[in-house]
Amino acid sequence: MSKPIRVRYAPSPTGLLHIGNARTALFNYLYARHHGGDFVIRIEDTDRKRHVEDGERSQLENLRWLGIDWDESPETHERYRQSERLALYQQYIDQLLAEGKAYKSYVTEEELAAERERQEAAGETPRYVNEYLGMSADEKAAYIAEREAAGIVPTVRLAVNEAGIYKWTDMVKGDIVFEGGNVGGDWVIQKKDGYPTYNFAVVIDDHDMQISHVIRGDDHIANTPKQLMVYEALGWEAPVFGHMTLIINSETGKKLSKRDTNTLQFIEDYRKKGYMPEAVFNFIALLGWNPGGEAEIFSREQLIALFDESRLSKSPAAFDQKKMDWMSNEYFKHADLGAVYALCKPFLEAAGRLTEKAEKLVELYQPQLSSADEIVPLTDLFFSDFPELTAKEKEVMAAETVPTVLKAFKEKLEAMSDEDFKPENIFPQIKAVQKETGIKGKNLFMPIRIAVSGEMHGPELPNTIYLLGREQSIEHIANML
């Protein structure tokens, strides 16, 4: 009988939720939900130097905003933070020490640095050289006594089988093999402060929580042989590993970097700008995976049903901010007006634009939105001075037919009663100008749009004129004549 599917997302509370970590969480979530398994959240907080206050809450809040839920977490289960599990780690440290599979190391940082320097000068690959090498039992005992008398606190190192072969069949990469001699020698599993190192603690946690599959970024591939060594030393079966490809900047082809200012890389940024979480979820789900076919817009339920780990890409996933914004715009265009208005309302309020026409303005510009914060610059026409025309717009307005069109349309607006001044009645007035003047197409619509809004392109012209108001529209046209 196969093991129950149990996967985990194990963030460090060291800052905001990055798009790469969000993808790790999302793929684990999709895998668990597709197979009817459990999705576990565990907090890896043993690196106290990098600990950020409120980092854990921020991670969980942003996951929830994305639409990711979980079955187990520190909120509902005890000892799901590594800092609460130190006694468990110590139990296995003691076991490995007692079995001779690990040992206490008294070498100092200064000695390690000097040895690295010597190795580099000699053209050797830096590695730890066992400090007890060549010592007799008496010499070893004397060395330890001397170090302890000097107050040196030891680390604990795992004794590496240099001749060992560590291999696994990766869910994404296929068969991967590492030689034990290539991990840099016996490595530290417990630091001087008593905290375990990452590669030791993660094995204890995954085994204790019965994790069946470890799905993570391929920057963890080099960690896997070390983790397999711990599984071997403790006599445990390792989980199935899957390493997702890097996320690269679509413009540079290089690994996504915090210096890439042309991309929004943290989920908090998308929240603050008023993106629709469903759109961000959809976009991230396609970073390194696709269900086949041409379709790109999927609901969460569809993605769960379609998720097939065999379609995880072996090639780097290109992060394209323009693609993200296109996808977000698709969601805005098809969303309920009430939901879009709720997203836009805080931005309009902050800009002092929460008037009685606010919801109508949102409806007008909804098809153009990729994020709710865009509603403020889009509505400048209704709250700011008339914009300066561009050279292209001035060229359009210099055509000899423009005065004829504007004068005729201005007269149509002036003749309309307040009761008749509605979007559905404005378009027939434009068509009447066409009939009377014989001017049509761009030569008709473009001058009216530029005269009214100061822009060549925009939302539906009758709605723009209606929301701007009859008097304001007439004034704008008059200023162009």
Swiss-Prot record:
It catalyses: tRNA(Glu) + L-glutamate + ATP = L-glutamyl-tRNA(Glu) + AMP + diphosphate. GO terms for molecular function: ATP binding; glutamate-tRNA ligase activity; tRNA binding; zinc ion binding. InterPro entries: aa-tRNA-synth_I_cd-bd, aa-tRNA-synth_I_codon-bd_sub2, aa-tRNA-synth_I_CS, aa_tRNA-synth_I_cd-bd_sf, Glu-tRNA-ligase_bac/mito, Glu/Gln-tRNA-synth, Glu/Gln-tRNA-synth_Ib_cat-dom, GluQ/Sye. It holds the Pfam family Anticodon_2. Catalyzes the attachment of glutamate to tRNA(Glu) in a two-step reaction: glutamate is first activated by ATP to form Glu-AMP and then transferred to the acceptor end of tRNA(Glu). It comes from the Bacteria. Monomer. A motif ('HIGH' region) lies at residues 11-21. The lineage of its organism: Bacteria, Bacillati, Bacillota, Bacilli, Lactobacillales. GO terms for biological process: glutamyl-tRNA aminoacylation. The keyword Cell membrane does not apply. It is found in: Cytoplasm. Keywords: Aminoacyl-tRNA synthetase, ATP-binding, Cytoplasm, Ligase, Nucleotide-binding, Protein biosynthesis. Belongs to the class-I aminoacyl-tRNA synthetase family. Glutamate--tRNA ligase type 1 subfamily. ATP binds at residue 258. This is Glutamate--tRNA ligase. GO terms for cellular component: cytosol. A motif ('KMSKS' region) lies at residues 255-259. Its EC number is 6.1.1.17.
